[in-house]
Amino acid sequence: MRTNFLSYLFSILCLLSCIKEKQTGADLAIGDPIPDFSVTMNDGTVVTGEELRQGVSCIMFFTTACSDCRQTLPHVQSFYDDFSGKGVTFALISREEGLESIQTYWTEQNFTMPYSAQTDRRIYELFAQTRVPRIYICKNGLIRAVFTDNPNPTYEDLVQVLCVEPHLEGVVFTLMQ
């Protein structure tokens, strides 16, 4: 009985130490600048923080094992379909997930969005400490909106951040706020 109690107590103490583990990484919010970074996308293009600071950008961190990410990714695909050719630059970046599992999931879902498979948290921690999905809508280098899993953003939520104005040479985006 005493051995069971000690095992139970040890387990509880281990769990508590995990809960109090110091979180690392930034905690970027609305108004913060996009950090410097560089990632190679699955299509071979390189996306940098410098590039994303020019105009409007959508940065998403995800893992395909995350149910909230799986719920959000189809909305982001629709957002990508409608706005990638109209001045919005996209960077979908995995958090601790390799190329093979993402590639399999993308194929199953018929996603066409380019992504960067990152097997560590190095890029993620420039932006956040916890939680995926995490979506940043930015304009001219500043974060203008942040979406997480509470609640999961919809296509309408993402589009609502943008105010689309017709222009002679295409579509000009002006972020609300």
Where are these regions (language model features)?
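Short, internal strand/loop/helix patches
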Residues: W106-N140
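A short beta-strand-turn-helix
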Residues: S38-S57
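Short pre-active-site segment immediately N-terminal to redox-active cysteine/selenocysteine motifs
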Residues: G55-S57, F62-C66, R131
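Conserved redox-active cysteine motifs that mediate thiol-disulfide chemistry
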Residues: F61-Q77
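Thiol-/selenol-based redox modules, centered on thioredoxin-like
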Residues: I137-Q177
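N-proximal helix/coil linker or "cap" segments that precede and/or mark the start of modular domains
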Residues: C18-D36, Q177
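Thiol-based oxidoreductase modules, predominantly thioredoxin-like and allied folds used
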Residues: G87-L99, F111-D120
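Sec-dependent bacterial lipoprotein signal peptides
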Residues: M1-L16
